[in-house]
Amino acid sequence: MRFAILSVHIAAASVGLLAGFVALYAAKGARLHRRSGTLFVYTMVAMAVLGAGIAAVWNVGPEVNIPVALLTSYLVITALTAVTPAAERSRALDVGLLLVACGVAVFMIGSGLAVATDGARHRVPAFPFFLFGAIALLAVVGDLRVLRSGARAGASRIARHLWRMSAALLIASLSFSVQLPKYLPKSLRLPWLLALPLLAVLVTMLFWLWRVRVRRPVRGMVIAAPRGALVTETA
């Protein structure tokens, strides 16, 4: 049973990573970008749910893996709602997702402080707790702004979508880089090689955020796609 669930988890993660990188480098707003991005969202949620279940049932670092699974699901779902037309969005869903992010932020930062003072839990140092807690806290700030001022528009909307999708891909890539050495020959366990996916996501995310926020307006980039229609930001 565990092997079957783990196999589906790994398969979802593999498909999700591939779809995520395709969406990251595909022409923004094109059909390939939208379809691969949607596939990335679905597979990341599936991967996260299965990962949380594995962590809870078989005690595989639950204090880290369960909140990270919640954070990953939260990031891709809110990235998707960021480009959903306001008329099709639910405020109750937005509030519920905000509470999830708040819970993750409080738990991870609190756990990080506990690990820093009492020693590592399950051989996990304090840094990952603080890292994921900071990501969740940053997302909470963005959600509060949306709930207070309404849905973002234009470049702000695109930036919200971009960084959340990229952060989820970064988390998936980090997990991949941590687990991959177990299956590689010793000669290929090179730190710079394992860090390449992380660097690729981080650099590409920063580039697009710079392009969206500094080089505005962005011609031909989709800011919403209601029911298959293409809505673009024009100069």
Located regions from the model:
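Alpha-helical membrane insertion/targeting regions
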Residues: M1-A235
